[in-house]
Regions:
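Sec-exported extracytoplasmic/periplasmic mature domains
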Residues: 36-43, 117-125, 141-149, 202
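Catalytic zinc-binding patch centered on the HExxH motif and its immediate surroundings
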Residues: 52-70, 75-85
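Zn2+-dependent metallopeptidase catalytic core
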Residues: 22-46, 79
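Acidic/histidine-rich, surface-exposed loop or edge segments in extracytoplasmic proteins
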Residues: 2-23, 120-122, 144
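Short pre-active-site segment immediately N-terminal to the catalytic Zn-binding motif
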Residues: 82-85, 89-111, 124-130
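Post-HExxH zinc-binding segment in Zn-dependent metallohydrolases
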Residues: 131-174
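Pan-zinc metallopeptidase signature
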Residues: 1-11, 15, 178-248
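Active-site recognition of the HExxH zinc-binding catalytic motif
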Residues: 71, 106, 110-125, 133-141
Length: 248
């Protein structure tokens, strides 16, 4: 067991370039809401920062030497850009800024918990088998679906599917032939990450998400095993995290 002497805390690094995103995030209060959830849920042996910062590239990171998660303003800006185009292509003029904001927050939600997956593996010295990047995607799924933001099942499922489409769009940004570097990367291919997230969402609730199969987004050959896959993720994380959860 560990001593619970630490807390998650949030910092916004001031930004000139991405001021509108900094202001928007502070208005939405998404990150502000995650801090008490995390501190109520998890014991920490030391403080861990969640920082919103300029990084020079659209990405997010966990730094094990600094015990810090960084979500980049560039990542939020790029997600905003991608989903503006996505909503245009799917809905034409009939989408609202609320639709866009909801979807961007959805993607931020999985991204934050993906990075926190890396953080918990490091902080709690959790054993993993398989690529840690896949395990972090599974942790994101576990939190979004089992502990949905705002106690709303639908949010978690929407966040999973929005993030899946984000991976698909990332794949389409580089449609050329795969390089050895792509296959050697520590992440699964973006297309694979799309199908994984779709599968686990379907596995969480096949009835609500049957459209994924009906619309051809998730092949039936994969869908057949998704309930089992998702159950395995939940039981695995339940076991791994048990020693580190706050007592009720």
């Amino acid at each position: 067991a560990i001593q619970d002497v630490g807390d998650f805390y949030l910092t916004y690094e001031p930004t000139e370039v991405f001021k509108e995103y900094e202001d928007w995030l502070k208005t939405e209060q998404y990150f502000e809401d995650q801090i008490p959830f995390l501190n109520d849920q998890f014991k920490l042996p030391y403080d861990v920062a969640i920082k919103i910062d300029e990084c020079g590239v659209p990405n997010a990171y966990y730094y094990s030497d600094e015990k810090m998660v960084v979500i980049c303003y560039e990542f939020i800006s790029h997600t905003d850009y991608k989903f503006t185009n996505f909503l245009d292509s799917v809905y034409g003029d009939s989408w609202t800024i609320e639709d866009l904001n909801y979807t961007v927050l959805n993607v931020i939600d999985h991204t934050l918990y993906h990075e926190l997956g890396h953080a918990f593996i490091d902080i709690y010295e959790l054993p993993t088998t398989g690529l840690e990047e896949d395990v972090a995607d599974q942790f994101g799924a576990y939190i979004l679906l089992e502990f949905p933001y705002g106690d709303d099942d639908q949010w978690g499922q929407d966040a999973m599917i929005a993030t899946a489409f984000d991976f698909w769009m990332a794949a389409e940004e580089n449609p050329d032939l795969f390089t050895p570097e792509d296959f050697a990367d520590t992440h699964s291919l973006n297309q694979q990450r799309f199908y994984n997230l779709a599968c686990w969402t379907y596995g969480f609730n096949p009835n609500d998400n049957q459209y994924l199969v009906d619309d051809g987004l998730l092949p039936e050959s994969r869908a057949n095993g998704c309930e089992y896959e998702y159950t395995q993720i939940v039981s695995g994380w339940d076991s791994l995290l048990a020693p580190f959860l706050q007592e009720e």
